[in-house]
Amino acid sequence: MLTTSSARFDVAVVGGGHAGVEAAAAAARCGARTALVTHDPATIGAMSCNPAIGGLGKGHLVREVDALDGLMGRVADAAGIQFRLLNRRKGPAVRGPRTQADRKLYAAAMQTAVAETAGLTVVAGACEDLAFDAEGRLCGLVLADGRTLACGAVVLTTGTFLRGLIHIGERQIPAGRVGEAPAVGLAQTLERLGLRLGRLKTGTPPRLDGRTIDWSGLEMQEADAEPVPFSTLTERITNPQIRCGITRTTRAVHDLIRANLHRSPMYSGGIASRGPRYCPSIEDKVVRFGDREGHQIFLEPEGLDDPTIYPNGISTALPEAVQRDLVRLIPGLERVEILRPGYAIEYDYVDPRELDLGLQVKRLPGLFLAGQINGTTGYEEAAGQGLVAGLNAARHAGGLGIAGFDRAESYLGVMIDDLVTQGVSEPYRMFTSRSEYRLSLRVDNADARLTPRGIALGCVGGHRAAQFAAGQAALGAARARLDAVSLTPSQAAPHGISLNRDGIRRTGFQLLAYPEIGWADLAAVWPDLAEVPPRIADRMKTDATYAVYLDRQNADIAAFRRDEAVRLPPGLDYAAISGLSNEMRVKLETVRPGTLGQAARIEGVTPAALTLLAAHARRGARAPSAPADRHPA
């Protein structure tokens, strides 16, 4: 651990949460000398809210982080205690891997992963300010104790710490999370630098003592019999798998909440900022969905040897006494004890439209932001941004250009494009529905989509690269074998495979596209196929199922990339474009899109404005002196 008064690094990352660890590890994997600055190294990898990783859309992000050799997938596999594949009955494109995680195991595994990352130094301290040289260029950090860290790039991953304020009923407690001081000086620095700041809110439920819950009458949710790991490097899940309980709120609970709404800061005027739409407080649920008989609550154990229960579904900021009365009106919780009250927390965030596609602040080269500071919510969203910001910080420190990810290749690209193009008015979370190319962006092909890119960018290590090459070779061999065998309808019939009597010969791959034909059916015809590992067989089935649809989607992707190829100069003077209305100029200047495609995704930008931009871009491309955009889409 660093103890000197000053030191020189290539990259300094502020914050040891889910964004910070991925940013620091990614920068270090890219060869940058990296510092991870955190108040308390013992809190690295802490799960501040729910004890779970993954889910719908979120599981895709974890797989993509893993494909780029990030940490979250491997750590979740090491700490997972209830693996479930969500949306199992739906198509492969929208299935989402998820696991409950043992909090202590998760933090311990993450801290081990950080400690084992070459080139990464953990620095205990609080970042109070940014340092700039005589020319106004960012050159380091100033810590609260007076130490300075000189560096070539900074990544801020401050979570809920920027002027964080906890609310419990009428009480207000300045804090980044329970028991930890907020980052006030750093928020003032960002304000002084002229960045557009806003205020958001999130919340968490009370923690319950599982030993005081009556589990006997509750529905129990089992883990999957065969856990699906997040990381392609994980051979098997070794932790015991646990069950979660399910209960519901009642009319009595709703009546109590309504009677005390005036004491909730969201309804008393104590909090004016917006919370996450898809993770509302129990107060919001009762107000917005007043006709419902009850709301489901998942009672999630926080560890294998920890009696603490996370009641997923009743986030609240009501006074502690009301919280106690509230939970004791819920079936199974009549005698429950609260270990820690729920609370809401407000915090500052930076308008993500200040950023480019590499998560660098446009007006402050070398400063990168990731996680809740960009207006997102969720561990997985934070981890994905952290990885992208970290690898780009390393590139900036090394004199290289920004590397962006586009919407057609990853959910990382979808998320970042949404943030920097649309901005946020409430905490942003990922869903598969946000992607227009989700048939291509599946959890099962994240490595095929992104690992080659990661190898080219230098953030994928040799072990993963070798494992990926072996996996791709196995997929290629399986596909070649399927393409080499075929059957006519009359040949298929004796094997119990029913096809239209059209006389057409179909390859093994084409046969696999039929919903009723599985790998076992083909192996009964060609026995050597039984030797193909299940993971490879499942991937072949998915590829065959989606083949026709992917051909159509690839045409859409080609059109998308044509617009993305029309670059707009970063210093473009929109006032000089004749015919643009003042409204269009304001929208474009706020985002400063890098491509015509990104401009088209800005809310309210008209086709007429896009035509003017396209004409201007074509004229600029013909002019030898036209500035080039160094930020690829």
Curated annotation (Swiss-Prot):
Pfam families: GIDA, GIDA_C_1st, SAM_GIDA_C. FAD binds at residues 15-20. One of its GO terms (cellular component) is cytosol. Keywords: Cytoplasm, FAD, Flavoprotein, NAD, tRNA processing. One of its GO terms (molecular function) is flavin adenine dinucleotide binding. It comes from the Bacteria. InterPro entries: FAD/NAD-bd_sf, GIDA_C_N, MnmG, MnmG-rel, MnmG-rel_CS, MnmG_C, MnmG_C_subdom, MnmG_C_subdom_sf. The keyword Flavoprotein applies. The keyword Cytoplasm applies. NAD(+) binds at residues 275-289. Its cofactor is FAD. It is found in: Cytoplasm. Its main location: cytoplasm. NCBIfam families: mnmG_gidA. Belongs to the MnmG family. NAD-binding protein involved in the addition of a carboxymethylaminomethyl (cmnm) group at the wobble position (U34) of certain tRNAs, forming tRNA-cmnm(5)s(2)U34. Homodimer. Heterotetramer of two MnmE and two MnmG subunits. This is tRNA uridine 5-carboxymethylaminomethyl modification enzyme MnmG. It comes from Methylobacterium radiotolerans (strain ATCC 27329 / DSM 1819 / JCM 2831 / NBRC 15690 / NCIMB 10815 / 0-1). The lineage of its organism: Bacteria, Pseudomonadati, Pseudomonadota, Alphaproteobacteria, Hyphomicrobiales.
